[in-house]
Amino acid sequence: MDILKLSDFIGNTLIVSLTEDRILVGSLVAVDAQMNLLLDHVEERMGSSSRMMGLVSVPRRSVKTIMIDKPVLQELTANKVELMANIV
């Protein structure tokens, strides 16, 4: 999977687990040079409760894991491989 960079996931929904046992689900808008994330349309899940948060900046140091649906990952990988094969 080292063919993809985090910036390749912009526009896709990510599931981000944070150090405070919180989970954020939102669409990746941007990644800065320090690998901080900007997510939009974010739903925060904590235990059995959840809330909508809108646009959220996520510091890299608070991220434990980042997940994406497998079919989306496979499609992104296939698109990137095809794009790289067509570069002259």
From Swiss-Prot:
One of its GO terms (molecular function) is mRNA binding. InterPro entries: LSM_dom_sf, LSMD1_Sm, Sm, Sm_dom_euk/arc. Residues 1-72 form the Sm domain. GO terms for cellular component: cytosol; NatC complex; precatalytic spliceosome; U4/U6 x U5 tri-snRNP complex; U6 snRNP. PROSITE patterns: SM. GO terms for biological process: mRNA splicing, via spliceosome. It holds the Pfam family LSM. Gene3D superfamilies: 2.30.30.100. Present with 2140 molecules/cell in log phase SD medium. Component of the N-terminal acetyltransferase C (NatC) complex, composed of the catalytic subunit Naa30/MAK3, a large auxiliary subunit Naa35/MAK10 and a small auxiliary subunit Naa38/MAK31. Component of the NatC N-terminal acetyltransferase, which associates with the ribosome to acetylate nascent protein chains in a cotranslational manner. NatC acetylates protein N-termini starting with methionine, followed by a hydrophobic or amphipathic amino acid, with amino acids at positions 3 and 4 also contributing to NatC recognition. The first 4 amino acids of cognate substrates are recognized at the Naa30/MAK3-Naa35/MAK10 interface. This is N-alpha-acetyltransferase 38, NatC auxiliary subunit. The gene is MAK31.
